[in-house]
Amino acid sequence: MSSEYRRNGKPDVTERVGDVVAQKLRHLEVLLVQPWSVTANRGNGFDLAEPAVLQIPNPSSYMIQKLLIHDRRKPAERAKDVLYIHDTIELFSDSLPALRRIWTDSISPALSSAARRTVSGAAEEIFGAVNDTIREAALIAATRPLDPIRIQEVCSAGLDELLRPA
């Protein structure tokens, strides 16, 4: 029988399969919904003998998974996740209507009603107002001037657009 915690009370976050130790990822199934295919080859900077087609999570799945795991993350990891969500929204801002369709047509129906409530609640809890996690995210982005208010506004507006009903 598997437990979320080890005998010493610490979270059990790894699993051994043969000689490989891997980190357990929560809500991994969300990352597998409508993955995007990209080709890695010499032409785009990968020193491969043959091109390799890779599947990567679509941006909607990526942000939803970050919202689902937020409460279980350490504070420093939460700040990194906030910055990842911010950067993903900025990078794909022109595609938010298409990303919303992925959410409404594929991701949301695959989640339990409790998970859907967690997503919407986490978006409001994390980005409803500037907080210490958002301030820490701004500090992490030290090489570029990011204001906590700007992070909060971008994430709140972007997630509102992503999660609003079709």
PLM regions and their residue ranges:
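Compositionally biased terminal segments of proteins
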Residues: M1-A166
